[in-house]
Design a protein with these regions (language model features):
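Membrane-embedded transmembrane helical bundles of large multi-pass transporters/channels
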Residues: 1-48, 56-63, 236-242, 246-508, ...
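Membrane-proximal extracytoplasmic
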Residues: 2-294
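Solvent-exposed, non-transmembrane loop/terminal regulatory segments of multi-pass membrane proteins
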Residues: 37-81, 88, 203-219, 471-480, ...
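Glycine-centered tight turns that cap/initiate beta-strands
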Residues: 102-103, 555-558
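Short proline/glycine- and acidic-rich turn/helix-capping motifs at secondary-structure junctions
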Residues: 110-118, 563-575, 738-744
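Short, low-order "capping/linker" segments at domain edges
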Residues: 118-134, 467, 570-586, 746-756
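Extracytoplasmic
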Residues: 164-310, 613-758
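Charged, amphipathic alpha-helical linkers/stalks
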Residues: 573-639
Length: 900
């Protein structure tokens, strides 16, 4: 029997007569779209670019950047127990990076400035300088001997002599002070020996030994020396997916090269800063989305193979879907022209959303085949009887997305345009390309063998066989089902009131990222805080006044401004340091020699160990407090000697050489540097280097104040308190914390607004489409039940909303309604009972739609990026909740209203 294609009218008539033309046109347009996207699409990686431009906080931010320049530096954190070692690493890295001005626009390394090396001690509090003086004077007897002959023999012999003099006359004048000095040096030496035992390298660190207060804690200067900061301003490749990639790659390459050098053993280095955080976020999310997209397609194919029971229909549906996605990319490029961290996931969205329209068409066609329809008639029925339902369903989803455009947040608005356009394209492809493919994939191209067995595999009987017991519960007791659903919905109100919003952007990053680890480390560092608010002052006097007010606030730790580089109490500090220099005038460093004098060492060690034991016994007899640290040192010393004895015939000489070299090789140079810093001159504002002036004084002559928080401010409550305090001094305060706080607030409000707009639009669509208040209300049942159950599931699993996963709320709203529309339309138009509707091809289609959406978004759970991962989790929970609403609650409601 031959088919008469001329009998088909309307859209399907056009498709059935020109399937090859439609497919060819679609493929050509898809290719053009892909090429156009490849050549033209750009990426916004900065969150600043996603924010509204007309707000006061954004105006303040732009004014600061315009006056003081780009300060989004790559931050290199260099750590070492020895300040000089960290400094040398930084200087070498600075020199290498300075050779690449086409990649690194500007470098800043405070340790490399002679200003700080010469005047660093003047920035210490007077109390810390007094502790430094006391410590140096306690160590002076040993330092004097070590400076003249830096060796293990000198160190141990000098300490032995000091202990013997004390033991000879413990009650003599000055003996108490000698004991304090001995205890101090033994404790310091013990620290070096333990470090050697742990890492195989010892270092007689002046910072470790001398820069400690009377409470034993390190001074701020010592802590800052152990963690040094180099900043690099990258040359950005605008429009690139990762604009600072070249600079970050260069810096990491140079760091890896330097760390391989033996002289930099013990140095650890990490990168952070806004460019690095954005680079790693975009790179991670890009990899994750690509992986998730591929996995989503695979899972969708598997689901379709199970549902369609044949390759031809699956191939037709997937080809149509891929064409729709390609065309959607072209639409996104043409209308918006760029992607951002939010809109980058729209391809995954379209896989789940776009395939549902094709599922309805194919399953209805199979159902018609099962009833004995001609294959072309079956395809026509699958298309024509779903047109209105698909249009309504797509309208609800598109409306949910279009409400994004009513918000002030550019990133959200752009996603709304792209996704709504993508939904419209998916519908257009479903109505044209998909039926064309179904026609072309028929045996004989639809011209021969019109029987059902030769084309699609038909669905026999009811599309979904429901077990009798389950069917009796679902459809035999609708009131019980509805009562149970109401109870669960009421119970879900408690989780709804408890679900939180996580404002911490670092929690969106992949776990274990170096940039995140170092961002937290800098936040906890009082000396090197890399996360601060910015206040601008009109003059130096205004800056000083604002700094005093800011530092009096409970949430502010300290303020750094140009005035901070002129030390306070200079006459007092200079007098103290000059006096100390005179006291140490007989400490004259001589060059280091590696001569171990092996023949003398056993006797020197034995005498030293015996004297320490005698001192411990004497202190125990006198019940002196110093007995405890001396006893701890004796244990450390015995462990060290035991290691030497163990390696006596293999590597004892190497161990001793390493120990002496690590402990004393750099001591002469360090002593010279220390002596130089003990002779500072008065510092005035005119002495501050231009590198610092440039960073803290703008083009307009205004002064910059960096306001460091007292506590971590990555979470909303401490951040809000900090900004409230800072803004009490200057309402126009800006900086990264302000931008994060305001952008997260705007994003949260934008999604809330979009949700309400979408709800209003969907109610309007339901009223217009159904022309019935009753069925419009019924259409809202899956939405309300699904949302409440989803939030309850999030609460049970400890999942909070965040700036990434909140994107799914309007989406769940649209999907919850559109699937209900299919069921209600069939129920009303074909007069079938609720149980038949749910188990028909339409019901199977809704079930399969939900599974494919769950699969496409669930694929995001393979992501390392926690924001992308959370989108997958929340959307999957939403689809499970909606599935319960479709399969259980909605049929019960329809059953209850039957005949009314």
């Amino acid at each position: 029997m031959h088919n008469d294609n001329s009998r088909y009218r309307g859209l399907f008539g056009f498709v059935v007569r020109r399937p090859r033309l439609i497919l060819a046109a679609a493929l050509i347009l898809s290719l053009i779209s892909v090429l156009y996207t490849w050549k033209t699409m750009t990426f916004l990686t900065s969150r600043v670019d996603l924010m509204p431009k007309n707000t006061q906080f954004h105006t303040d931010y732009r004014a600061w950047r315009q006056d003081f320049g780009d300060m989004e530096d790559i931050v290199v954190v260099i750590e070492a127990e020895d300040q000089e070692l960290a400094g040398r690493f930084g200087l070498e890295l600075h020199a290498r990076l300075a050779l690449k001005p086409e990649i690194i626009r500007e470098l800043f390394f405070p340790f490399g400035l002679d200003f700080f090396r010469r005047n660093g001690l003047l920035f210490m509090p007077v109390a810390d300088l007094q502790s430094l003086r006391d410590n140096l004077l306690l160590a002076k007897p040993v330092l004097r001997e070590l400076a003249a002959a830096p060796s293990v023999q000198t160190l141990f012999s000098t300490l032995t002599g000091q202990m013997e003099r004390y033991l000879a006359a413990p009650s003599a004048a000055g003996a108490e002070r000698d004991l304090v000095g001995i205890s101090f040096m033994l404790t310091s030496l013990g620290s070096g020996i333990r470090q050697f035992g742990e890492s195989g390298a010892a270092s007689f660190s002046l910072q470790e030994v001398f820069f400690r207060g009377k409470d034993g804690k390190e001074s701020a200067l010592a802590r800052a020396g152990k963690m040094q900061i180099l900043t690099a301003l990258p040359v950005r490749s605008e429009g690139s997916f990762v604009p600072a990639e070249l600079a970050i790659s260069l810096i990491r390459t140079e760091i890896d090269s330097l760390k391989k050098r033996p002289e930099f053993k013990g140095v650890t280095v990490g990168l952070t800063g806004v460019p690095v955080l954005e680079h790693e976020e975009m790179a991670t999310s890009d990899r994750d989305v690509k992986t998730a997209t591929a996995l989503s397609l695979v899972l969708t194919v598997i689901l379709l193979l199970v549902a369609f029971r044949g390759l031809r229909n699956v191939a037709a549906a997937m080809i149509a879907l891929v064409i729709a996605i390609c065309l959607s990319f072209g639409f996104a490029t043409l209308t918006v022209g760029r992607l951002n961290i939010l809109s980058a996931v729209f391809a995954v969205m379209l896989i789940g959303i776009g395939i549902e329209y094709g599922i309805q068409v194919v399953l209805r066609s199979q159902e018609e085949l099962a009833r004995g329809a001609d294959p072309l008639d079956a395809i026509a029925a699958g298309l024509n009887r779903n047109i209105w339902g698909i249009v309504m369903a797509a309208a609800t989803v598109a409306a949910a997305f279009l409400t994004f455009t009513l918000t002030d947040f550019k990133g959200v608005s752009e996603l709304g345009i792209i996704a709504a356009g993508g939904v419209a394209i998916c519908v257009l492809v479903t109505f044209t390309v998909l039926p064309a493919l179904l026609v072309l994939f028929m045996p004989g191209n639809g011209a021969q063998e019109a029987g059902a067995g030769k084309g699609m595999k038909p669905l026999s009987g009811s599309a979904l066989q429901c077990p009798a017991v389950l069917g009796q519960f679902l459809f035999g007791h609708p009131k019980r089902v509805i009562a149970l659903a109401i109870i669960l919905c009421i119970a879900s109100l408690f989780p709804l009131s408890r679900i939180g919003f996580d404002y911490n952007l670092l929690n969106l990053q992949a776990k274990g990222l170096e940039s995140v680890t170092y961002a937290y480390k800098l936040m906890k560092s009082k000396e090197n805080s890399g996360y601060f608010a910015v206040v601008v002052a009109d003059s130096a006097a205004d800056a000083e006044a604002k700094a005093r007010r800011l530092e009096s606030l409970p949430t502010v730790d300290h303020v750094v401004s140009l005035n901070s580089f002129v030390p306070d109490r200079q006459p007092e500090k200079i007098a103290l340091l000059h006096s100390l220099r005179r006291d140490l005038s007989d400490v004259q460093p001589k060059p280091y020699s590696e001569d171990l004098q092996l023949m003398e060492l056993p006797e020197v060690f034995e005498r030293f160990r015996t004297t320490v034991a005698r001192l411990k016994a004497e202190l125990d007899r006198g019940k002196r407090n110093e007995a405890v640290p001396v006893g701890e040192f004796l244990k450390t010393l015995d462990a060290f000697f035991a290691r030497l004895e163990k390696n006596r015939n293999s590597n004892a000489l190497g161990m001793l050489r390493d120990f002496q070299g690590g402990m004393l090789a750099e001591l002469p140079e360090k002593l010279k540097l220390l002596m130089a810093t003990l002779e500072p001159s008065p510092v005035s504002s005119a002495d501050v280097p231009q590198e610092l002036v440039k960073r803290f004084k703008g083009k307009s002559g205004k002064y910059l104040l960096q306001v460091a928080p007292r506590n971590e401010i990555f979470d909303r409550e401490p951040l809000e308190a900090f900004l409230r305090d800072v803004r009490s001094v200057d309402p126009h305060a800006t900086g990264e914390p302000v931008m994060v706080y305001e952008s997260m607030t705007i994003m949260r409000d934008a999604y809330r607004g979009a949700f309400l707009y979408a709800l209003a639009a969907i109610v309007a669509i339901l009223l217009v489409a159904f022309r019935s208040v009753k069925f419009a209300v019924i259409g809202l049942v899956p939405l309300l039940v699904g949302l409440l159950f989803m939030v309850a599931g999030m609460w049970v699993f400890g999942i909070s909303f965040n700036p990434a996963n909140i994107i799914v709320m309007p989406l769940v709203l649209g999907i919850a309604v559109d699937s209900g529309i299919y069921l209600i339309n069939r129920y009303r138009n074909e007069g079938e009972p609720a149980e038949v509707v749910v188990t028909s091809s339409t019901g199977v289609g809704v079930f399969l739609n939900t599974l494919t959406i769950m699969a496409s978004f669930g694929a995001l759970m393979v992501a390392h990026h926690q924001g992308v991962f959370s989108i997958g989790v929340v959307m999957s929970l939403g689809m499970v909740a909606c599935q319960v609403a479709f399969v259980v609650v909605l049929p019960a409601v329809l059953k209850l209203v039957e005949g009314r």
